[in-house]
Amino acid sequence: MVVHFAFLFHIYQPPVQIPVVIKQIVNESYTPIINSLHNHPEAKITLNINGTLTEQLHDFGYDELIEQIAILAAKGQIEFTGSGKFHPLLPLIPEPEIKRQIKLNNETNRHFFGRIYSPKGFFPPEMAISEEVLDTVKKSGFEWIIMSGIANILPEFPTTYISQDKNSLNLIFRDDYISIDCAFDKINNVDNFISRLYYKNTSEDYYVILAMDGETFGHHVKHAIKDFLIPLFDNVPNRNDVKICTISEIIEKFPKGPKQTPRASSWSTMPYDLAHDVPFPLWFDPQNEIHIEQHRFFMYALTLIHLAAKYRESMDQEKKDIFDNARNLLDRGIHSCQQWWASARPWYNTDMILRGLNEVLMASVNAKRSIPENVPDIKEAMELIMNDMLKAQNKIILSL
């Protein structure tokens, strides 16, 4: 009997992250992880890197790191996933915006990694899923999507078969217990990790999916690469009882099982959140006034952008440039971090809340500026929308 396990490392930094933090994380986490894979040819991971981080690595001079990731992907040691470029919480945005974020992510990562970037699987930011998100991911051409174990509604947790949704999208469920214990340094040596993998009393092969922020290794948990990851990569090739895989390799090995419609949730959703019908508590808690106003603010901004987009063809080049800047600012501004920092569960950071708010506000102002002079009625309508936007903004600022 063999336990097949796969690591999914999710690496991302918000587009408003400061350069000194990027540099620190590259040195503490990203580079050592990539080096450890190069030094262990039999080791492999599934990697989600959001396009905004790929761009940041390029902008800050880390092209060699991008190249090394691509080399490992070409060797089969890294399997890429798709995602939303700027890490929005997908269930909270309309389907056209979900499609746009997926498209932007594919274009950016393919530009930097080349044709080796051709993901079969999809990582929804924060593992936040809904039925609409699953439908959009399937229509976007992906074969599988990963989500938290709490999303599973079958009586049995899938470990010997691959569950699917109604559209035959393969559903991959994270083992939340082992993943969280790895992320919070409760599992920090090889023996402990292997013993946790062997939690089922069975004679048949099964699989375990571990997924966490890649920054866990070396940045959040300083010793995790030296004391856990490298020893694990040293140890696994010499064993017959466990096998390290990519997620797609696990899907190929195990048969298809029952279909289900997984529950809306994220990897931070707890049972008591679901009991109170709050599937995305760190980003849209009905009891959190900032979350409510942030969402209202975003929706007003989306309305302005979509309204301006209808007039793009009649804009002169200067106006088109202004609109394109507005569109890019909104793409960036709907990243999920600002809601996360407003959750106060337990994290709270007014600077990160305001940075995200500012990008959305700049997008809205530029959307209004882009409207041609010969359609004054539209400008007046946009001003009315912006008045309501500013009310939401004031509520956010006054509550900080």
What does each of the following model-derived ranges do?
Residues 64-82, 106, 138-157, 161-173:
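Acidic, His- and aromatic-enriched active-site or binding-groove loops in soluble protein domains
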Residues 17-20, 56-61, 91-94, 129-138, ...:
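A short acidic (Asp/Glu
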Residues 30-37, 66-70, 99-109, 134, ...:
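Generic structural signal for well-ordered alpha-helices
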Residues 3-94, 100-101, 120-124, 143-148:
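Short, well-structured secondary-structure segments
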Residues 123-127, 147-149, 173-174, 211-213:
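Short His-Asn-centered micro-motif
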Residues 2-31, 38-40, 165-169, 176, ...:
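Active-site and substrate-binding clefts of carbohydrate-active enzymes
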Residues 97-126, 196-210:
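CE4/NodB-like, metal-dependent polysaccharide N-deacetylase domain
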Residues 155-199:
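Alpha-amylase-like alpha-glycosidases and glucanotransferases acting on alpha-linked glucans and related
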